[in-house]
Amino acid sequence: MEMKQINETTLKIMITMEDLEEHGMELKDFLIPQEKTEEFFYTVMDELDLPDNFKNSGMLSFRVTPRKDRVDVFVTKSDLKEALDFNDLSDMEDYSGLSPEEFLKALEDNFMDKGDIEAHHKLEEHDKTLKEVDETMTEPAKEVAEETIREDYTHYVLAFSDFDQVVTFAQGLKNVSVEGSEFYKLGDVYYMTILLYLADEPDYYANNMYARFLEYANVADRTRPYLQEHATILMEEDALPVLQATKWS
């Protein structure tokens, strides 16, 4: 387990799947607060060397977010002098064994308030890089740097008429690996952004992959910036790998 202090009121605890197994925990144990979950959090808090301002700090709330290889627990303290509150496990879903409808409802219910969770999207990193280019480089140098970034990566926005189509998309692309992916809902339509890394691939790779995507998805009528501003984000990162790994009942 690793711990990182985000700010004065929030800690991020990174728990590997091996850590969970050692403590007799499974992902599904976090779906509904229970005594086992409470005992696990007490154990984690005891094992870690908490910052002084988190010791005896009163009420603590927890948000649990699954990743591909670990579970991230965000611990937020309040000034209320109450016992630990284990009822705020709002960001955790049991990704296996749910029907598509149950999975979707869990996402819509639990991914509305992302609070202080750090975003590590590759696309956002590239946006930041381009801004730094604008601030520090001469005009010819900027053109070269921007062109290099664009050549190394490409991204697509795909649309889905319903969640069943999303499931079919993920199942049909079981062996496809992408650099990044996000999952949105706008009205009755679902959207997924896909980031591909092209540097080590042949020239035809991007077109071939896009054609494969469109075997299961539709061409989107919205851009990523538009979705970021107007849509509900259901999964901030690794959307496709999570959906690929999910066993649908």
Swiss-Prot record:
Any one GO BP annotation for this protein: negative regulation of DNA-templated transcription
The organism's place on the tree of life at top rank: Bacteria
Regions crossing the membrane: none
A UniProt-annotated Pfam family: MecA
GO molecular function: protein-macromolecule adaptor activity
InterPro entries: MecA_C_sf, Neg-reg_MecA
Annotated Gene3D superfamilies: 3.30.70.1950
Role description: Enables the recognition and targeting of unfolded and aggregated proteins to the ClpC protease or to other proteins involved in proteolysis.
Subunit-level organization: Homodimer.
UniProt free text on domains: The N-terminal domain probably binds unfolded/aggregated proteins; the C-terminal domain interacts with ClpC.
Family per record: Belongs to the MecA family.
Name listed for the protein in its UniProt record: Adapter protein MecA
Organism: Streptococcus thermophilus (strain ATCC BAA-250 / LMG 18311)
Gene for this chain: mecA
